[in-house]
């Protein structure tokens, strides 16, 4: 049976969706883009290494090097899948994705959190929701998708120490994990739950827009955070994911290990945590400063 490129992509994506939901969408975009580029070639066996090279060269004027490298990983995984099934003679080893290190990104600090939180009033529902969201992102290091997926039933009873936990599902790995937050954040949670449980709303999600009765969109949360960071004069480009990166750096700054980062951020692969070992600009300056030799003026004059 001759395998067409269109069918091979569909079959691969269906297999991919059985164990991950977040990667499915981005894989689909890149693979369909590749399919459109290689036309009029229609079958999988017609593809060779020259097609891969030409495709990625065509992306250079429109996309970043990181995006092109990601596309290379997508195609490599795709061809490994079909190489394993014996449907292509093309050797995926010819695809060598280059790993580019992203520029130093802005992260949220504990002081940034306080500055943004101080702008919000707990007696206003919209402010309370925003305040709860940024505190949960900081305390737990959750991904935004994980936070917005939380249902009311996922939240566990409060412990005697004032801490509380919730069960979250990671779209990336399709695994359930436990997240925990502190007593200050739990005070916000209790206040919000008192209102949320009284809402006449069919949705079981924790964080819903009272006007639409639907869960908040990632774009809405991003807009809030941008507005809050500007109002707090942070002079940073803050995203919801900046809280996760900030939490990792905070753990390391407090003397925690990469193992602690891996556990608290719930990384499936331990090597994912090693990216945080790369020193931020501030931590690099602090470390370098400790090991610089300082000479007195007199010593320099007599030398």
Predicted segments — roles?
Residues 1-303:
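Conserved catalytic core of the tyrosine transesterase superfamily
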């Amino acid at each position: 049976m001759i395998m067409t490129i269109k069918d091979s992509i569909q079959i691969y994506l269906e297999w991919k969706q059985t164990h991950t939901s977040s990667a499915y969408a981005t894989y689909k975009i890149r693979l369909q883009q590749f399919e459109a580029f290689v036309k009029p070639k229609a079958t999988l066996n017609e593809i060779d290494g020259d097609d891969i090279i030409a495709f990625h060269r065509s992306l250079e004027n429109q996309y970043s090097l990181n995006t092109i490298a990601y596309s290379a990983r997508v195609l490599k995984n795709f061809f490994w899948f079909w190489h394993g099934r014996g449907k292509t003679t093309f050797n995926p080893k010819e695809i060598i994705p280059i790993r580019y290190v992203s520029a130093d990104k802005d992260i949220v600090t504990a002081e940034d959190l306080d500055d943004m939180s101080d702008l919000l009033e707990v007696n206003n529902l919209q402010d309370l929701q925003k305040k709860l969201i940024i505190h949960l992102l900081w305390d737990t290091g959750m991904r935004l998708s994980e936070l917005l997926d939380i249902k009311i039933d996922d939240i566990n009873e409060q412990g005697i120490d004032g801490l509380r936990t919730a069960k979250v599902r990671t779209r990336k790995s399709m695994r359930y994990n436990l997240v925990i937050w502190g007593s200050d954040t739990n005070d916000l949670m209790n206040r919000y739950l008192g209102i949320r449980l009284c809402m006449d709303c069919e949705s079981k999600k924790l964080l819903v827009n009272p006007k639409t009765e639907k869960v908040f969109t990632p774009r809405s949360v991003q807009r809030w955070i941008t507005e809050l960071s500007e109002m707090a004069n942070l002079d940073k480009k803050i995203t919801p994911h900046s809280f996760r990166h900030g939490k990792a750096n905070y753990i390391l700054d407090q003397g925690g290990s990469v193992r602690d980062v891996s556990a608290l951020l719930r990384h499936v692969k331990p090597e994912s945590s090693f990216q945080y070992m790369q020193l931020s600009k501030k931590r690099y300056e602090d470390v370098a400063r400790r090991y610089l030799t300082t000479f007195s003026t007199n010593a320099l004059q007599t030398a």
